[in-house]
């Protein structure tokens, strides 16, 4: 095939005319491009000016400078300031032979991990403090298997005024076997004699003081037994409606039975079946009984607003182990702070009309400083700084610090956890803290702090080398009367 070539038949004159036309076209195109560029620049400038003239004005953010002050540094007092107070074990000399029975035979049932309550009170009104030890007993299914297991009862000891106690349980009306948990003392019938309320796994018990060293069971008449399948822990008498008689708040723990316990089946590696946290047990509601003034109570738990449900599951939330009745804002009406195990703590503010509002979260008491729940158990309150600030102390599980919530100066219903700055946090972290108690042990006018400690598992060291089954109590001395001007120091 021949290659195509340009047509050479055109004359030279025609070629010159074509080149002239091309040159004129290039000039026109160049001029058009130049004016297009000018127009584009003009439009950009005009658009920029228009945008800045008509754009929405930004809201002015007012910046306020503020000075953030660090917490006041706590000065740990020198050793010479901490009193060298000694305590002596006098149980045997005092004549106390009570032995607690948790009913354990090897099944590792959760109630067995709880110690029962104890109360100092003057039951015979002779001017000295007597002692009541609440007791557990053997489980009924174990008694059927082993008839040699004899039921055990609580122990009542009368103080002779000379530091010696006499066991007067037999014949007192308290020599009854049931799986007891906690105890509350109060004169519910206003006859001048202290009465007894015992919480339990199963039905709770009310005992009216007859004044002759004997008590009678008035649970049925008083209508305060609670549910047969409930597990109640702590309780407190308090006059919630300011009518002159004592009402009754009762903490309930978890929904429990032997069958449920085995379904949960908590185990530890290297140990096997073990006592564990209540995480996988369903929660419950606390109970509130209003004293009607005639020896009877009315259950107002539902109408009082204390039945708190999980926002996520709508199931009962409470897993309560401790309660402290206290007038938080000093308005003349008693409120309740409730220590919950692995769910947030409750603060029930008295609304002065027979109902309460729950404000654990917004008060600052519900959680730790990181917004997490803890294994809260024992609870007590005190104005340990000797001023208007209220302290709420709560004993928590192992590897969790004591909580020491302190009310703020400008809002008595707002608390911050000052456990670290007050000196009780780091030293208490390792221990598993069941009971907690404010008292002035050295009589210097400042409330000190005691915790009662111990682990659930006898073989816990196999799993956690830092833990032990037996743990000593821990005593913190209030340094308020020293140059430190506050805080606590561990007493060795």
Regions found by a protein language model. Give the residues of each.
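Acidic, glycine/proline-rich Ca2+-coordinating loop motifs
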Residues: 1-492
